[in-house]
Amino acid sequence: MSSESKLILIGIISSPYGIRGQVAIKSFTDPASNILNYELKDYRKNIIKIHSAKILSKKIICNIDQIVTRTAAEQLTRTKLYIYKHELPQLPDSEYYVANLNGIKVKNLEGEIIGKINNICNYNAGDIIEVVYNDGKKIMYPFTNEIFPQITEDFVVIVPPEFI
């Protein structure tokens, strides 16, 4: 799959809302309302067209094209919402998208390649980076400047907590 056609997860339909087919969306964009600026797709690349939306607390409540009953909205629960990677805005050199870190090399302070980033998770308390070391061992670390002091397109430098 080319980078032009690669899908990036930017939100999820978390639940139905009300009785008229509205849904609540959890956005992974910053700010959350930015999700409304994109043409959203499901994993099959079907377009999810939003008619209208309002922000309530931490949820985005949406009316989706052709969804007019609660039963129809319930069927969309847990639908992941994607955009094409090339739709993301270009960032300054000092910034990066967390999703772009997946699979890049991990180096120690001496510059030796000691593993790679295997996964990035967010449990609402901040991003967690899973590193797979060259020996196969997997360890999860909080994504902080202290633990990951250098980040480039090609690698990150790690200072594991026992060394801080």
Swiss-Prot record:
Species this chain originates from: Orientia tsutsugamushi (strain Ikeda) (Rickettsia tsutsugamushi)
UniProt free text on domains: The PRC barrel domain binds ribosomal protein uS19.
Matching Gene3D superfamilies: PRC-barrel domain, RimM
Keyword field contains Chaperone: yes
One GO MF term: ribosome binding
Function (record text): An accessory protein needed during the final step in the assembly of 30S ribosomal subunit, possibly for assembly of the head region. Essential for efficient processing of 16S rRNA. May be needed both before and after RbfA during the maturation of 16S rRNA. It has affinity for free ribosomal 30S subunits but not for 70S ribosomes.
SUPFAM superfamilies: PRC-barrel domain, Translation proteins
GO CC annotation: cytoplasm; ribosome
Protein name as annotated: Ribosome maturation factor RimM
UniProt entry tagged with the keyword rRNA processing: yes
